[in-house]
Amino acid sequence: MASATSNNPASSSMSPRRISGNHGSPTASVAQSPRRPSRQVSSPWTQIVRGESEPIAAAAAVAGPSSPQSRAPIEPIASVSVAAPTAAVLTVEAAAGDEKSEASGGQDNAGKKPVWKRPSNGASEVGPVMGASSWPALSETTKAPSNKSSSDSLKSLGDVPSSSSASSSVPVTQGIANASVPAPKQAGRANPNPTPNHSRQRSFKQRNGASGSANGTVSQPSAQGSFTELPSHNPSPRGQNQKNGFASQNHGGTENPSQRDSYRNQNGNHHQSHGGRRNQEHGNQNWTFQRSFNGREGNAQSQRGTPAFVRHPSPTVQPIPQFMAAQPFPSHIPFPTELAQSSYYPRMPYMTPIPHGPQFFYHYQDPPLHMKLHKQIQYYFSDENLITDIYLRGFMNNEGFVPLRVVAGFKKVAELTDNIQQIVEALQNSPHVEVQGDFIRKRDNWQNWVLRRNPTGSGPQSVDRADAVAKRLGNLSVDQSSADPIGGSSSQLQPTEALSDDQQQSSSTAPVSNHNAPDGANR
């Protein structure tokens, strides 16, 4: 679309901004249009502001026939002054009829059509319209600082190219409410592509007309004569004034360009097609993304989209655990002093140590001594010893008893003890010997070991022998008492060996010689 803009200088010169450069001359702008025949247009709003007295009926007659859709019933609008409301209704109907006629017969693109679709009649009579006599006089302070007058700016509205006619066509409810006239814009902001798009214009016109008739809401003028705008039902983020091509009228009749630019920056991007590029390069970057329509759909509804970058919520910072002081030790539980009563207990009496009494020592006889005595004497009267011990058998009487003094005088018994009473106690329960008084003998078979004596031989020799034995025993007892106080004696009487039968016979025939040792023991 940039090439179309550069190749059509005539169309760019016909933009509303170019018209403001011609000081509002409608004839000059029409003469420059090569596509449509020139036709002078007299705007009804120009007559209203100037105070011309052209009748509204003549304006309605010149407008020509319109389509049946333009004859929709419209509620009359209450005027500011005492003027009849029919004039305003007729003016609105004429404007609506011109718009519908252009929508139906706008297929011929011979030339650009004026806004109000009728030539201006210079010979029209000038008369007061809509109670102009009751309007307050405009002061000099309300004039714009621009060199152009308000009348010149209103004249420039008479001839507008068809590219902006779609934006300047206003529904019934909004066209009357927005009675302001745009101030001349800067030449640098001219639309570089004013190519008309009649199909899009017709669709917007029909849509705006349908919305205006469907709503049925008519704005009421204020008491001061300025028109207020009702809230629009259009969900577009941009204002309805920019969509319809009319800026809101200031109290002074002019518009500040800086305010308009700030309004555009705050309410959305201004639709400017710079060769298919978006307006983001001009510093007007906001979160509302606009689609570029290359100048054909400049009045289309802006489309909202999701932001390019959505900042995620910052991660929550976990608090650093601070130092926790240790809990102090709880104080001790107070104990009431009145309950602390001292208790006294008597001490234990002093125990005097028990004095040691006389010591008693009991003499326990050695058990092995009895066993030793019993074993040794039992051996003397055993069969193995009596066979060879003729000496012991010689002390036996006819009944086989042997005196205890003879047995106690033996060497083995004398080493154990010399106490005859102790020997008797050791032999009380012996199964081999028998003790009767001071004599002892073999318990069984004692007659087998008694020696036979010759009656002829039993003379003084036998008596001497018995005396010698008794003497020896007496000496033994005396020696025991003198040598050993306990009763022991070192000298022991050894029994004679058992003699055989031949020896006994020889001994019976021959006298037995006693060989006494120095200690008196018989060997």
UniProtKB/Swiss-Prot annotation:
GO terms for biological process: abscisic acid-activated signaling pathway; leaf senescence; response to abscisic acid; response to jasmonic acid; response to salicylic acid. GO terms for molecular function: mRNA binding. The modification Phosphoserine is found at S33. The modification N-acetylalanine is found at A2. Age-dependent accumulation in rosette leaves. Residues 363-452 form the HTH La-type RNA-binding domain. Coiled coil: none annotated. It is found in: Cytoplasm. GO terms for cellular component: cytoplasm; plasma membrane. It comes from the Eukaryota. Residues 1-16, 32-44, 146-169 have a biased composition (Low complexity). Keywords: Abscisic acid signaling pathway, Acetylation, Cytoplasm, Jasmonic acid signaling pathway, Phosphoprotein, RNA-binding. It holds the Pfam family La. Disruption phenotype: Impaired abscisic acid- (ABA)-, salicylic acid- (SA)- and jasmonic acid- (MeJA)-induced leaf senescence in detached leaves. Residues 22-31, 206-270, 282-305, 477-516 have a biased composition (Polar residues). Belongs to the LARP family. Promotes leaf senescence mediated by abscisic acid (ABA), salicylic acid (SA) and jasmonic acid (MeJA), probably though the induction of expression of senescence-associated genes (SAGs) and defense-related genes. This is La-related protein 1C.
